[in-house]
């Protein structure tokens, strides 16, 4: 059986953007650092890494749309943190952010990773931003690198 997969390596020529939702920045700043670390560790050239800042997670899909429409990026890593509160706001923001990112990804056919935390409390967010449960920004970047290489291997 022939196995087709993407490797975790960059040539240094790939242009990747990180879209970061600034809301809950104490968490999202750490996700960005994790994503940047993964990019550099796997051979990325920092000159080819861009950081796009948006106010909150709800704005990520529109920034993603504009970033991919520009043709400037080979892939995009989306990070943010939506923390449940006492109102239904969490449900609306989480659902629409997820759907929006998925729709834009399918429209453009470019690798996009989903590193948006959807958690019940700040403790869970901090754990997923590098304290106990790894750094989900790092994981999101490795996922997008792997998919970028998979697309190349598939001739896409």
Curated annotation (Swiss-Prot):
GO terms for molecular function: 6,7-dimethyl-8-ribityllumazine synthase activity. It comes from the Bacteria. One of its GO terms (biological process) is riboflavin biosynthetic process. 5-amino-6-(D-ribitylamino)uracil binds at residues 23, 57-59, 81-83, 114. GO terms for cellular component: cytosol; riboflavin synthase complex. Gene3D superfamilies: Lumazine/riboflavin synthase (3.40.50.960). Keywords: Riboflavin biosynthesis, Transferase. The active site is at residue 89. Belongs to the DMRL synthase family. PANTHER family: 6,7-DIMETHYL-8-RIBITYLLUMAZINE SYNTHASE (PTHR21058:SF0), 6,7-DIMETHYL-8-RIBITYLLUMAZINE SYNTHASE DMRL SYNTHASE LUMAZINE SYNTHASE (PTHR21058). HAMAP family: Lumazine_synth. Catalyzes the formation of 6,7-dimethyl-8-ribityllumazine by condensation of 5-amino-6-(D-ribitylamino)uracil with 3,4-dihydroxy-2-butanone 4-phosphate. This is the penultimate step in the biosynthesis of riboflavin. This is 6,7-dimethyl-8-ribityllumazine synthase. The lineage of its organism: Bacteria, Pseudomonadati, Campylobacterota, Epsilonproteobacteria, Campylobacterales.
């Amino acid at each position: 059986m022939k196995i087709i997969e993407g490797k975790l390596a960059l040539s240094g020529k790939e242009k990747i953007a990180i879209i970061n939702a600034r809301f809950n920045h104490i968490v999202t700043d750490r996700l960005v650092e994790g994503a940047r670390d993964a990019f550099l560790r796997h051979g990325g050239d920092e000159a080819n890494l861009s950081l796009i800042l948006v106010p909150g997670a709800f704005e990520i899909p529109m920034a993603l749309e504009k970033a991919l429409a520009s043709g400037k990026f080979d892939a995009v890593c989306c990070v943010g943190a939506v923390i449940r509160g006492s109102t239904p706001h969490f449900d609306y923001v989480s659902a629409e952010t997820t759907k929006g990112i998925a729709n834009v990804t399918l429209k453009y056919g470019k690798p996009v990773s989903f590193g948006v935390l959807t958690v019940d409390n700040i403790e869970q967010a901090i754990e997923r931003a590098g304290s106990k449960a790894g750094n989900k920004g790092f994981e999101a970047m490795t996922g997008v690198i792997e998919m970028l290489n998979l697309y190349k291997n598939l001739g896409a």
